[in-house]
């Protein structure tokens, strides 16, 4: 949320150095910080910059949902030679999850809940809402599949498209602004490629 104080260095230095050096200089750095709505803070500390960072060539953007995503994606980010934005949702810090030994790679989404009637796609805290919604939909005999994007850039088109081809319906959940947002990009992928 104070990343805006460093945004020039993130966008114009870290993200562009590899290209400006003709591929000779890598910038292996991870910018890790809070993202999304927060509790009892001012407006400038409660917003979602996922789409904004995703617009920038040269940046990878990760947004974990649970402790497995956070642990594995952070390890992968540290090993990656590129600048990475690692967005954590403050309201998820106190959530309890079971830690597994699953390996997670940058660019791989997860089918968090299997389903056949509807695909719900989200990332970070939105996955929690999507899972809760899928449980309520079961009471109506609707089996929703939940996709945890994990990585916003590069985005896992295959997992999204495979699910939507199976269910023929999609809902995208995000906390960010709707205009030019992550949901708009996901819907564009579905409309153009499914």
For every predicted segment, state its role.
Residues 6-13, 48, 185-189:
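Alpha-helical scaffold elements adjacent to nucleotide-binding pockets in ATP/GTP-utilizing enzyme cores
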Residues 16, 69-73, 104-108:
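Glycine-rich, charged/polar anion/phosphate-binding loops
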Residues 22-80:
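Conserved thiamine diphosphate
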Residues 1-4, 63-65, 176-180:
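Active-site nucleophile and cofactor-binding loops and adjacent substrate-binding regions
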Residues 77, 81-83, 186-190:
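Glycine- and acidic-residue-enriched helix-capping/beta->alpha junction motif
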Residues 1-22, 24-27, 38-40, 90-194:
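Thiamine diphosphate
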Residues 31-33, 61-65, 85-88, 146-147, ...:
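General beta-strand structural signal in soluble alpha/beta enzymes
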């Amino acid at each position: 949320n104070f990343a805006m104080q460093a945004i020039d260095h993130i966008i114009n230095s870290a993200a562009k150095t590899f290209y400006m050096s003709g591929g000779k200089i890598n910038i292996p750095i991870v910018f890790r910080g809070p993202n999304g709505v927060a509790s009892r803070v001012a407006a400038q500390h409660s917003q979602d910059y996922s789409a904004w960072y995703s617009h920038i060539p040269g940046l990878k953007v990760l947004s974990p949902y649970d402790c497995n995503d956070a642990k594995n994606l952070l390890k992968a980010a540290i090993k990656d030679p590129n600048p990475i934005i690692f967005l954590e949702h403050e309201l998820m810090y106190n959530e309890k999850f079971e830690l597994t030994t699953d390996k997670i790679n940058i660019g791989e989404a997860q089918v968090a809940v299997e389903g056949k009637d509807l695909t719900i796609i989200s990332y970070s805290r939105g996955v929690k809402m999507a899972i809760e919604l899928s449980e309520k939909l079961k009471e109506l005999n609707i089996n929703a599949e939940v996709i945890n994007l994990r990585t916003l850039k590069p985005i896992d088109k295959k997992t999204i498209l495979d699910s939507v081809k199976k269910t023929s319906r999609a809902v995208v959940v995000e906390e960010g602004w709707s205009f030019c947002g992550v949901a708009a990009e996901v819907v564009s992928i579905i409309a153009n490629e499914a």
